[in-house]
Amino acid sequence: MIKKIILFFAVLIAIVIGQQPLNVVPYPQQVSIGTCVIPVAPGSILIESNIESATFSVSMDRYTNLFFPFSNESEPSSNESFLLSVTIYSDDETLQLGIDESYSLSIEQGSYQLKATNIYGAMRGLETFKQLIVYNELENSYSIVCVSISDSPRYPWRGFMVDSARHYIPKNMILHMIDSLGFSKFNTLHWHMVDAVAFPVESTTYPDLTKGAFSPSATFSHDDIQEVVAYAKTYGIRVIPEFDIPGHAAAWGIGYPELVATCPDYAANVNNIPLDISNPATFTFIQNLFTEIAPLFIDNYFHTGGDELVTGCWLEDPAIANWMTKMGFSTTDAFQYFENNLDVTMKSINRTKITWNDPIDYGVQLNPETLVQVWSSGSDLQGIVNSGYKALVSFAWYLDKQNPDNNIHYEWQDTWQDFYAADPTNNISTNAENIIGGEATMWAEQINQVNWDVRVWPRAIGIAERLWSAQSVNSVSLALPRIGHFTCDLSRRGIQSGPLFPDYCPMQDDLVFTMKPNTKLSKSEIKLILNK
Amino acid sequence: MIKKIILFFAVLIAIVIGQQPLNVVPYPQQVSIGTCVIPVAPGSILIESNIESATFSVSMDRYTNLFFPFSNESEPSSNESFLLSVTIYSDDETLQLGIDESYSLSIEQGSYQLKATNIYGAMRGLETFKQLIVYNELENSYSIVCVSISDSPRYPWRGFMVDSARHYIPKNMILHMIDSLGFSKFNTLHWHMVDAVAFPVESTTYPDLTKGAFSPSATFSHDDIQEVVAYAKTYGIRVIPEFDIPGHAAAWGIGYPELVATCPDYAANVNNIPLDISNPATFTFIQNLFTEIAPLFIDNYFHTGGDELVTGCWLEDPAIANWMTKMGFSTTDAFQYFENNLDVTMKSINRTKITWNDPIDYGVQLNPETLVQVWSSGSDLQGIVNSGYKALVSFAWYLDKQNPDNNIHYEWQDTWQDFYAADPTNNISTNAENIIGGEATMWAEQINQVNWDVRVWPRAIGIAERLWSAQSVNSVSLALPRIGHFTCDLSRRGIQSGPLFPDYCPMQDDLVFTMKPNTKLSKSEIKLILNK
């Protein structure tokens, strides 16, 4: 109780000295607080937009349902209604890297105005507006403070990697994850779809690939993928598939053994098995598969992995070793040959390649347009941006690790502070402009739909804010009360996000955690959303 | 996929060499595997007991509902029914430390026999029986292996501490926690009810105590407590309240300021405020409060905390400092005086005191009957058992810590291995017989009902097995496949327990996590259970 009072005073002091006075996460770029506080009754807030959009309609309906978590318990209101007027200046719904996500929000007595260039900026504004509605438990009432906000993200790529290979993640859980990412203003879902242990993606061209799934019922159909892409679009979240090759390819070989290298000495670790790149049929296979899969996504980027290739397996496979000798290839040459061939496929499917930083570490010259996701270290990142590549930071944001930054806190959840401290430009002295953002990763060796939420939240909030807010927004003590409000709010929305300090979060009596999305899109909605 | 195969072979090898061939957690003392495997159809297993017991009836109904998680999806069975015949030799339902929890289980073609001294041993046997029923996803079928098991726990005190002070834990969530503890054969719920930040326990004698609760709706009534005690009894789980005094007492002072010491220099940390023991009214208050509360519990033990007393606060309070001078008391003397007075109350309410090890560290001579819960270290434990006290191990089992045993794993969940390795007798050379068990602790600074399951499970399974199984059952690699089955099974039962390695756990399509118990007891059932 006294700790609560201390936090309360901390917030009060923050207001007095003008720092982060709003409980909004990620913290907006510009905030100007007014003097009025407007009571709002459940059901009294209506959203009206100046444009017709199937995609944005879903977003408006979603937030209208989220504004008042305890509305079922309230008396019907006789108060007047408030209209949140949304002005969107362009009806262009193109969702690609670099779209304008800015918005402005003005709350005054009698006037709620949200303005944005496009629907995606408006979605960010709706989330901020939702967070401004404060619930008072003792009075069972809601209010909103008068405020003027002007906001836009620091980085255009605010990604989250979901691994649906180490454990199968049902489609509904992936949609549920998207809810949580959208609430936190992440804008990119990096879908690590397949890996050494499992190939859960259905292919019409190569139906035996899903023999590499954990179970016939643990697979993603084309319809599943399209639903995920459409659902993500209702949050302004791009979806980028990863097919991790040439390493981590054992699961490809369950249905198509000829695709993978044979190396008994390495086979005890399933992660050691790469594709057999000596066989031209392998490249035909990749070409055909990606030609089938890529159109299910709308994004210009396509992730081809490239990490942790075990070239020793290639050398142990006589056919591959002979081919390398014949070609006069070192292992680096062979890896280079693979990446060069992959570029041909990327061009034919009209996609820009993303890889992990491993090919570069291995001496491979990547196509200069390749986007490099750095999981190794800040010094590797410095070299990569100096070489002119655009890059994503991931090394600091491994949510699976016990000690992500080698810091030891008392509580495991306090690792959020390490994520928060990891500014993408830390120790980067030159070419920082080549860093276009970053990605949190939740590798799934010890994750399935049951524990994903709690292992990710509230810790990933620190990453979300780092990627969106100004670099100067970096105080743990100022962030803490804001995150406290937000994590409680996430729980009420059905996202399992625990607390970071002793406090009280009133929740709905009938709250259950469903591992399902908050909105069910119909087939016709999916079609409308994808075609716009 | 290949990793799965490796695990499969590991299990096969274990069977061949006779080690832990059953996927049962905690592993039983004696197992003899037969040669037959019996197919069982959903709904076909009936349980029949030779005694009438309201308490055991709840347990039988519960398990009957749990045997077939996918039964709703199955065709009605035309197979024959199987009768699990339960023989209980005594109808004595006394639930106290040291009751006989042994059972034997014999599964043969046409005969399922569970035998136990009392209903609590029979409950352990039902849990083992449940774990023996194996689900085959591809065939959507169930089977059970022929086996003969004779089992009993290594330690009589297998406890779990739940902190409902740092965050309020709704009654339904405490009942849900009891489900998870019962499934894992924990037998003691140590309910850390109040602490510095909150006093959520309603008192009819002192109604202002709940002014120290986070909210008027964040409290436990007498009825709530009795429901918890009755519900725990349906799992053979004892419930022991902790009222942590004389330190950590700030929340007592919200409603009754005269109870607590005043020390401005220490007040910045709410944990620093102890009771004012110079005031005789404090002891009257404790006496009256405990006289009211103790009868709500049926256990002979009562935990009075005693940890982290900040005597500096006493010395800064002029009234207390003057009283100490008058009495000629050092701080140790004052602490001794407090514990001596507490013993008088314990005697009057007919309870045996438990404290944390701090009074002993402080030089206090505790009543020799005091049970000491050691949270500091193994060397302290050695000294305490050498002094003749009975003791509980807790220091190795702090579930809140990032690095519980200062070991760094790659994944946070792998800290289960540290818990598993922590044998209570590690580094104990003498008087190990004074260790009567141990307790996992889940302190709640960063825990509420939303994230408790995932932060506790599957890691606490390692503790459950350490306290139940033979000391020689200590191989991580042999435990892993068993825990893999069990954690999947926990999920299907509604307990959020994640995986420890890449695998596939088929779950019900309609599975939701409710933070509620699997059984709702009626008021008349609660009365019947408590009165037996």
Curated annotation (Swiss-Prot), chains A, B:
GO cellular component entries: lysosome; membrane
Superkingdom assignment: Eukaryota
Organism (species): Dictyostelium discoideum (Social amoeba)
Pfam family, one: Glycohydro_20b2
Protein name per UniProt: Beta-hexosaminidase subunit A1
Main subcellular location of this protein, as a coarse class: other
Glycan-carrying positions: 72, 79, 350, 427
Function: Responsible for the degradation of GM2 gangliosides, and a variety of other molecules containing terminal N-acetyl hexosamines. This enzyme plays a role during the slug stage of development in the maintenance of pseudoplasmodia of normal size.
Active-site residues, Swiss-Prot/TrEMBL: 308 (proton donor)
CDD domains to which the protein is assigned, alphabetical: GH20_HexA_HexB-like
GO MF term (any one): beta-N-acetylhexosaminidase activity
